[in-house]
Amino acid sequence: SANPALAPRERKAGCKNFFWKTFTSC
């Protein structure tokens, strides 16, 4: 969870952070 601002939101969506902003662990 590199981005605490949108980490919990993207994790809920399903690892969208990969191409959302940066790499985040689901």
Curated annotation (Swiss-Prot):
| InterPro entries per the UniProt record, alphabetical | Somatostatin (IPR004250), Somatostatin/Cortistatin_C (IPR018142)
One GO BP annotation here? regulation of cell migration
Q: Which GO terms describe its cellular component?
A: extracellular space
- Tell me the domain of life: Eukaryota
Q: Which UniProt keywords apply?
A: Cleavage on pair of basic residues, Disulfide bond, Hormone, Secreted
Q: Does the keyword Chaperone apply?
A: no
Provide any one GO MF term from the record.
Answer: hormone activity
Where does this one sit in the cell?
A: Secreted
Question: Mostly located where?
Answer: secreted
Cystine residue pairs = 15-26
Task: Give the family from UniProt.
Answer: Belongs to the somatostatin family.
User: What the protein does?
Assistant: Somatostatin inhibits the release of somatotropin.
Protein name stated in the entry: Somatostatin-1
What organism is this sequence from?
Amia calva (Bowfin)
**What is the primary gene name for this protein?**
sst1
